[in-house]
């Protein structure tokens, strides 16, 4: 599971269902690996236009500016808007999203209830220690 897709599992029931499904199909000794953003880094603090805006040129040659705007944070949940301002349009296209920021302890609890255990958790894909400054939590689960 990549691209921080885990964060789109908003309800406890959704995470439990996903982890139970993984547990049911995971081969003995196999691992399920996924990434999620580290809530200790509070990345949503940078989801404001002045810190998130980038400019790109689309494959068709149209210039586009992208940025994020934090809407609200409530507990584990962060809601934000993503703006796409195309040079050939008068108004930006806006997409609203909500993501859940689980701690490693929460992930461990969900895993345990599904018959899984965390066998490794690191702070990036290169294997750095998980700290408050690493932007990622890379989780390796194994069936118990």
Give each language-model segment a name.
Residues 16-28:
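A short glycine-rich, Lys/Arg-flanked "PGG" loop and its adjoining helix->strand segment in the class I
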Residues 1-13:
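A short SAM/SAH-binding and catalytic strip from SAM-dependent methyltransferases
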Residues 12-16, 134:
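Conserved strand-to-helix beginnings and helix N-cap segments that scaffold or border functional pockets
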Residues 12, 33-109:
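SAM-dependent methyltransferase
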Residues 98-144:
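C-terminal lobe and adjacent flexible extensions of AdoMet/dcAdoMet transferase-like proteins
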Residues 5-8, 40, 125-128:
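Short histidine/acidic/glycine/proline-rich micro-motifs that form metal-
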